[in-house]
Amino acid sequence: MLPARRVRSLIAAASTVVIAGTGSAVDVAAQGNTSPVNDRPNPYQTVEGWAKLPDGRAWGSTSAVAIAPDGRGIWVAERCGVNNCLGSNLPSVYLFDANGTATRAFGAGLILSPHGIDVDREGNVWVTDCACTLRGAQAPGDKGHQVFKFAPDGKLLMTLGKAGGARDSSGLWQPNDVLIAPNGEIYVSEGHSSSENAIARIRKFSKDGKLIATWGQWGKGPDDLDQPHALAMDSQGRLFVGDRGNDRIKIFDQSGKLLQTWYQFSRPSGIFIDRQDRIYVADSESGSVAPTRKDWKRGIRIGSAKDGTVTAFIPDPAENPPSTSSAEGVAVDAAGNIYGAEVSPRALKKYVRK
């Protein structure tokens, strides 16, 4: 069974916003921000310590989790025991079986800040290196700001972007996430900074890596992006982008026309859409870690990608963490188990039905 596809973003003109899962739509510019849905039941229980790294090694930060084509294997990109792989020779990409045992590992010495991940229909693994978690350290000019395509055995098949990055069309800058559409086209969301005039855009490539188009610019308006952090695609081929800095999900068609804007899923760090068009949205930055959103709740919101209804919510068990908490990346296997990749807690959590 093939895994569900995930998607990306784009930019366009006027649109609609769905209010708090009601399904009603109004003009985005007139509406402005809307508080997320916080009061849905939690039908899941948490499995701590499920996945074990080789040799008893401690987990580093992770925001990247995806499902293998068999619906059972779990691919994770992990930051070498800390929050980046600068100077490390540890592998950063792992495949776990259904029991949480690492069965494959690769990527050592190649990736500085593994951030986003996708697995295509052939089982190839795509990982972004945003070079955005170095905490003041100087990134070497021969690494960073790239997207890597690996065969399932770890062989490097393709590289998008040039080492060291570029803010213009000659390269990528802080690629947050990558999505491979069913037709093989590649979408990359760029820009991890929320500062004014930062890079915030979507790149579209052909299946062989040729740049087709670029959309987006930084801003706070209805047609802008601010830190496009996550990508996913539904069964209709609509592109979902987690416009995290603007606390919303933007939905586009594949030509870049803006269709809807949703606020009810909170501040989206990660998005996953399964084959039944259930949507899973991870918020790792609200509540106590966000002064302007103290009344919002971190966690994973679950609902319908068809109409935006929120039906369930897995809250972050940490009430007052000092920094980002709960899942930043999210994926769901063929059995319906949810996996949350966490940055500050440095963990891969599993959520199963109660």
List where the protein language model places each region.
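Bacterial N-terminal signal peptides that target proteins for export
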Residues: 1-14, 22
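Short hydrophobic/aromatic-rich motifs at helix boundaries and adjacent loops
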Residues: 11, 19, 34-35
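Active-site-proximal helix/loop capping residues that flank conserved catalytic or ligand/cofactor
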Residues: 14-17, 48
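C-terminal segment of classical bacterial N-terminal signal peptides
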Residues: 17-27
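Eukaryotic scaffold repeat domains enriched in small/polar residues
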Residues: 26-354
